[in-house]
Amino acid sequence: MHFEKLKEMEYQDKTNEQRTIRVLMSGGGTGGHIFPAVAIANEIKSRFPNAEFLFVGANGKMEMEKVPQAGFRIEGLNIAGFDRGNLLKNIGLPFKIISSLWKARKIIKNFKPDFAVGTGGFASGPALYVASSLGVPIFVQEQNSILGKTNQFLGRRAKAVFMGYPNISSFLPAVFTGNPIRENIVTDIINTKEAKEKMGLDPNKLTILSVGGSLGSKTLNNAWREFLPKLKEKNIQLVWQTGKLEYQNIISQCGSDEQGIQIKEFISDMALAYSAANVIVSRAGAIAISELAVVGKPILLVPFPYAAEDHQTKNAMALVEKNAAKMVKDSEMNEKFWNTLMEICEDENLRKEMSSNLKFFAKPNAAKEIVDEIFKILKTK
């Protein structure tokens, strides 16, 4: 039924503005799962303004707040992941899974989607499994360089698995599209010197941008506490995003902004900050790397070592193997961090080579490519 309806759409006299399709979206738990789902939905909506969307999330998780803020309807399942740290918390998990499957079945039968897209997270497992069981075509988007457990399971049922990285097992219908990123990262990047001037920095001095996410990175923050005096001696500028948890402590310890050193709790205009940087230090989350690849600045990655299946290290290694980035482990945030950073800062040819190699991973139109593939696949079935 779903394929036939989409094939009919190709030949109807109606314009896209008049057509109505129903799309089930599921992804959440972290921003890295939520943002791609919203970006894909927005791309579909730009082509089919009358399209109806329903997101399925996990109750109590951030998608229940973020998705409505993005303008989409969402229903929640009482589902959670397996807790490796406290096994007793998993006693009720089988009952939650069964309950979620039943609720997902009810949601999908009522909504009657034409197809479903999952971007990972607790709720996408039951939502897309049930959709597939009911004959709804499903598509999976994987942000990391390795498939998460949920997407491994769903990938075998999917019409396509859209990969953020090119290296994925051949037994799945994988398509390398890259990860959807914020549109302004593509459109608002400006000349480096101009960006430095806008940020009140010396346009002629090399500038490092350090980003650790909205909560910040304790590892990166501790490193800058240690190496800030050496950085000043080198006459290198630093834009240091601390995150909200440690901002006040860092300000009291290191002082407020001084010439060439900007300490910020949060950076609202990331496109401007990226533009101003000559070198970027970052964790190795999938969406962060996708943005950095499009920005094309030399990067030093410090993977978060406790990410599921150590996927941040695998993300970073995908770039390191192409000489598109340097990596320092969390346990190596000592002189090795400093020496690696200075190797990048003091070698202009190396910086140019890293920037050039990053282009292999840059996919500024990932959401468009994903939606193109979805409709190409549906119309040929």
Give a label for each model feature.
Residues 22, 52, 62, 73, ...:
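Active-site-proximal region of nucleotide-activated glycan assembly enzymes
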Residues 2-3, 10, 364-381:
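C-terminal alpha-helical cap of glycosyltransferases
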Residues 86-115:
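An amphipathic, basic-hydrophobic alpha-helix
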Residues 350-364:
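A short, well-ordered alpha-helix in the C-terminal region of glycosyltransferases
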Residues 113-115, 275-290, 297-298:
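Acidic donor-binding loop of glycosyltransferase active sites
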Residues 21-28, 47-95, 212, 246, ...:
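Conserved nucleotide-sugar phosphate-binding/catalytic loop shared by glycosyltransferases and other
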Residues 2-57:
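N-terminal subdomain of nucleotide-sugar transferases
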Residues 61-62, 66, 70, 190-280, ...:
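Donor-nucleotide binding loops and adjacent catalytic segments primarily
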